[in-house]
Amino acid sequence: MMTTIKRAWTAVARKRRRSLTIALIMTLIFTLLIGTLTVQQTMAQLKQSVERNIRVGFSIASKQPSGEVPMDIAQRVQHLDKVKAHNFQAETTAGLPGKQLVDVAGSGVQLDSNVAGEAKVTGATQSDLLGEFTGRFYQLEQGKHLTEHDQNAALVHKTFAEKNGIKPGDKLDITKDGRRVTVTVMGIFSGKGEKPAVLQSDMAENHLITDLAAAQQLTGSQQLTRATYFAENPHQLKSLTDRAKNLPNVDWQKFSLTDNGAVFAGVLQNIAGIQN
């Protein structure tokens, strides 16, 4: 009788252990499934955020070093469907009367003391859409970015501002070939250029960013150095560039069209790999 009871108790105990083991395994499986679903949901949200916020687009520039992009061509591309934003740019070099440029450290270049150096001037529709800012080479430290609504406005580098005692709200004269433009400093940025500087005008510290009209007044031309466009969605970039290339009466032998789609495609592929 005692043997029968003992065997029965042992069987029950074994079933309990087996049941607990099965319960633990099922709990682990459900935890892993929930974790996988959470990761997939997180990556899906990340993908949507990346697609919504990244600056996928293309730029048009002349194939000639000193060439220009006609404003009428730039505006025709701007009005294509699915263009989310644009940024027109005009670049030149100019003098800054009464101001001292930052010297090129270790360049070995000696300028005549009677010859004033020139700063690089970039006029833009929106300063925050310039490659230096979207690529994180420059960071806005004070003030605000320039928009298409600003007139006679500029951003200056922190080092240049400190050397000349400049602060937001101050006036700054810019001269080019007898033309003069007075701008108000709206903001101060910091950072370095992508490439080493040889001349003063190559230095980020001597880079002056203005509204587009101010730079065009200095050059005496309404034409552009570069026109940049951003797609509403990364998946629309190819069709958008194809439509730009098929615009009538545009000689694409004279212009280059480059896009940054390959950079962001890798990011999206990595996210998709984790999802799968």
Language model features with spans:
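N-terminal Sec/SRP start-transfer signal
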Residues: 1-33
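Alpha-helical transmembrane segments
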Residues: 19, 30-56
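Peri-transmembrane interface segments
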Residues: 43, 236, 240-276
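Membrane-proximal extracellular/periplasmic loop immediately following the first transmembrane helix
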Residues: 47-127, 243, 247
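Subset-of-secretome marker
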Residues: 62-65, 87-108, 178, 198-204, ...
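Structural beta->alpha junctions
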Residues: 62-66, 190-191, 229-236
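Hydrophobic secondary-structure segments that place a key small or acidic residue at a functional site
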Residues: 120-125, 129-212
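Glycine- and charge-enriched low-complexity intrinsically disordered segments
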Residues: 205-228
